[in-house]
Amino acid sequence: MIYTITFNPAVDLVIQVDQCQLGELNRSKGEAYVAGGKGINASLVLQRLGHVNYATGFVGGFTGQYIKDTLIQEGVKPLFVEVDGITRVNVKVKSQEETEINAAGPQVSPEKFAELLAIFERDLSSDDVVFLAGNAAPGLDVKAYIAIAKLCQERGAKFVLDTNKQLLTECLLYRPFVIKPNHHELGEIFGVSLKDEAEIIHYAKKLQELGARHIIVSRGGEGALLLTEDGQVFSSDIPKGRVVNSVGAGDSMLAGFVATYLETGDFAQSLKRGAATGSATAYSVWIAERQLIDDLVNQIHVVAH
């Protein structure tokens, strides 16, 4: 089974305006509510690619119910722990520029985290894959990530890690199956500015030395690099298209990669479909649909180094 964990999911309120002026009344030309969070995005992509999965984490109130309802409509199985308060609402104002206001989210108590951990202590096996995605919720810290990562290692489950620099580096010891920093984030980990492909590969290998098994480094318009555990290096380009929405593109890429690897065990094919999935989300209003992913796959070229 595949599980995704989003400690601090959100409902994203996307508002379209001609021009956003601070201190003035701004009228919306249109708005939309969507379920958000890295693990949520991964769950939706996995489901659309035919992989049944459980979405876990913490939700509360009517916004938490909205997220669960959205997932159920998509075929994802919600397995959240309910907390006091309401799941946060993040506001994204789109005009000539995009402005975001992200809420803090509800507090998660040690008792509530213990409830979530108990689910995995009861059910997790070596056949499972766990996406540990996003940042910590209020009340949680790196210990929560380490607890999940350590349990995955002990049970022999693959775990996929997509989070910030501190949380990522603290969990490398537990041998994540795959991580996906972009080239800026990779440079920040080591305090350097990466100028070319050779430098990216050099520092990605250092992350492997610290424990990561496979690493995807996304490079925006220049495509992506994949370094595998057995020393292979692949690069991909990206298909042509107009970027509509950058939110969730990286999560989609990672989900597309993992879904394809589980189906084929082929790294080149996995990178190719992962790149197509990330691009399909970037070229869509929300999370990518299967048809667009399939259309874009044939436009992508993967090269072994």
Model segments located where?
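Conserved beta-alpha-beta core of the PfkB/ribokinase-like small-molecule kinase fold
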Residues: V129-A198
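Short, conserved phosphate/pyrophosphate- and ester-handling motifs at nucleotide-, phospho-/glycolipid
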Residues: L46, N182, G250
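Short glycine/proline- and charge-enriched loop/turn segments
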Residues: Q19-R27, P181-H183, F234-D237
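Hydrophobic anchor at the start of a short beta-strand
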Residues: I2, H51-N53, P78, F159, ...
